C-alpha cells in the first residue's frame, strides 16, 4: 500500500465493505457440493461393484474401465471442492482478523475532530503541543493500517496459492466401433 494513503481510507473500506459473509457462505456451499459429489461417488462405486458381479465380458470390462476413470476423477474432484472450501474459510478468517487490527473509523474521526477543535481554539499557540501529539497519533494510525493491509495482502496471496488446480473429467469413451 502507498505510504500516503489516509488512515481513514483504509479503515472506512474495511469496516464499511461487504465483510467476509459472502466468503463464508461460498465455503458452506462448497462443503454441501463436496458432500453431494462424495455421496455420488460412493453410490456409483457400489452400483458398479454390483453390476460387475452380474455382467461379464469385454463390454463390461470397457464399461468398468470408463466408469473407474470417471469415479477416480469424481473422488479427486470432490476432495478438491473440500480443499477449496477450506481455503475460502481461511481467507474469511484472515479478513476478519485484519478487520480487528485496522484502527476503527470512529477512533480516527475522533482524532481528526479533536485536532480541528484544538486548531479553532489555538490562541497564541497554546494547543500546538496537543495538536502535534494528535497528528503523531494519526500518523501511527496510518502506519498501522498500512502495515495491517500489507500483511493481509501477502497472507491472502499465500493462502490463494493453495487453491487446487482443477482437472477436466476424463474421456470415458474411446470411440471404438462395434
UniProtKB/Swiss-Prot annotation:
| Pfam families registered for this protein in UniProt | PPE
Q: Name one GO biological process term.
A: response to host immune response
Signal sequence residues: none
Q: Per the UniProt entry, what species is this protein from, by scientific name? A: Mycobacterium tuberculosis (strain CDC 1551 / Oshkosh)
Name assigned to this protein: Uncharacterized PPE family protein PPE59
SUPFAM superfamilies, sorted: PE/PPE dimer-like
Please give the family membership noted in the entry.
Belongs to the mycobacterial PPE family.
**Gene expressing this chain:** PPE59
InterPro entries xref list: PPE_dom, PPE_sf
Amino acid at each position: 500500500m502507498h505510504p500516503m494513503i489516509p488512515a481513514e481510507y483504509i479503515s472506512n473500506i474495511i469496516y464499511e465493505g461487504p465483510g467476509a459473509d459472502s466468503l463464508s457462505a461460498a465455503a458452506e456451499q462448497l462443503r454441501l457440493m463436496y458432500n453431494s459429489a462424495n455421496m455420488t461417488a460412493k453410490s456409483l462405486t457400489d452400483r458398479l461393484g454390483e453390476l460387475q458381479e452380474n455382467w461379464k465380458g469385454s463390454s463390461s470390462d470397457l464399461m468398468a474401465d470408463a466408469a473407474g476413470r470417471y469415479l477416480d476423477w469424481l473422488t479427486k474432484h470432490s476432495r478438491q471442492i473440500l480443499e477449496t472450501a477450506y481455503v475460502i474459510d481461511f481467507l474469511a478468517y484472515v479478513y476478519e482478523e485484519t478487520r480487528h487490527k485496522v484502527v476503527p473509523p470512529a477512533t480516527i474521526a475522533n482524532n481528526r475532530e479533536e485536532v480541528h477543535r484544538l486548531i479553532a481554539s489555538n490562541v497564541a499557540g497554546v494547543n500546538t503541543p496537543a495538536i502535534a501529539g494528535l497528528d503523531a497519533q494519526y500518523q501511527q494510525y496510518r502506519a498501522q493500517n498500512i502495515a495491517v493491509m500489507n500483511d493481509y495482502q501477502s497472507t491472502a496471496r499465500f493462502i490463494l496459492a493453495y487453491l487446487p488446480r482443477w482437472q477436466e473429467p476424463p474421456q470415458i469413451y474411446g470411440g471404438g466401433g462395434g
